[in-house]
Curated annotation (Swiss-Prot):
Function recorded in the entry: Catalyzes the formation of sulfite from adenosine 5'-phosphosulfate (APS) using thioredoxin as an electron donor.
Cofactor comment text: Binds 1 [4Fe-4S] cluster per subunit.
HAMAP family with a match to the protein in the record: CysH
Superkingdom of origin organism: Bacteria
Family: Belongs to the PAPS reductase family. CysH subfamily.
Enzyme class: oxidoreductase
Keyword NAD: no
The protein's name in its UniProt record: Adenosine 5'-phosphosulfate reductase
Residues involved in [4Fe-4S] cluster binding: 125-126, 208, 211
Organism field: Staphylococcus saprophyticus subsp. saprophyticus (strain ATCC 15305 / DSM 20229 / NCIMB 8711 / NCTC 7292 / S-41)
Gene transcribed to yield this protein: cysH
Pathway(s) annotated for this protein in UniProt: Sulfur metabolism; hydrogen sulfide biosynthesis; sulfite from sulfate
Length: 242
């Protein structure tokens, strides 16, 4: 694997096409090691603290113990998510875990934009509470890590290990692209990792309270998000603006 730094302006889409993905982590450990060796302090992991996030935190901490981990705190998350963050902080005390707040409180958003904006215009709500905060976080970074997997949804099937991120004009590193949902849980159980307790109650994907529901039956691992809506992404991984 090349030690050359890949940037947004000097992007090489073919850098990892020959990577061996037959190891336990399907290439994830090697991609993470490369990313932190090359980018150092100029790479940030934006973590939602979902199941995939627990794996990435575990792998990242083995490479860079003081890595910067940012949680986009919309002020609309489940208490179980905040409890998980506290448990993760206790297990990995050297990690630099930060909670990034939006510029508007929920009360200010209701007054200045609309009450319960997530009902009237969920794209705008995600833009204010997630996309803009991440833009601020990444303003000084060259690259960021994401837990996207190809299996998660049709919109994510073309994701590569290294991606030119047009939304944030950055490089997006996605170490888990080849993992299945079973792979995720096999690793969590094998390494006795913490995870959000809502996963035990039929929540495969966990976001903000108003936009997340438990699911019944089989579906992709994004099921339960924005139910009865055509919306499938918060916007962090698309180039469309609200």
């Amino acid at each position: 694997m090349s030690e050359t730094k890949i940037t947004y302006d000097d992007f090489n889409p073919h850098a990892f096409e020959t990577l061996d993905i037959t190891d336990e982590t399907k290439g994830a450990r090697e991609v993470i090691r490369w990313a932190y060796d090359v980018y150092g302090d100029s790479i940030i992991y934006s973590c939602s603290f979902g199941a995939e996030g627990m794996i990435l935190i575990d792998l990242i901490s083995s490479v860079k113990k003081d890595a910067e981990i940012v949680f986009l705190d919309t002020n609309l998350h489940f208490q179980e998510t905040y409890d998980l963050i506290d448990r993760v902080k206790a297990r990995y005390p050297e990690l630099n875990i930060k909670l990034k707040q939006p510029s508007l409180t929920l009360e200010e958003q209701a007054d200045q934009v609309a009450p319960a904006l997530w009902k009237q215009d969920p794209n705008q709500c995600c833009y204010i509470r997630k996309i803009k905060p991440l833009e601020e976080v990444l303003s000084g970074a060259t690259a960021w890590v994401s837990g996207l997997r190809r299996e998660q949804s049709p919109s994510r099937q073309a994701t590569n290990f290294i991606n030119k991120d047009e939304r944030f004009k950055s490089v997006k590193v996605c170490p888990l692209i080849h993992w299945t949902w079973d792979d995720v849980w096999d690793y969590i159980k094998a390494h006795d990792l913490h995870y959000n307790e809502l996963h035990d109650f039929n929540f495969p994907s966990i976001g903000c309270i108003p936009c997340t529901e438990a699911v019944s039956g089989n579906g992709d691992s994004r099921a339960g998000r924005w139910t009865n809506s055509t919306k499938t992404e918060c916007g962090l991984h698309t180039t469309n603006k609200p």
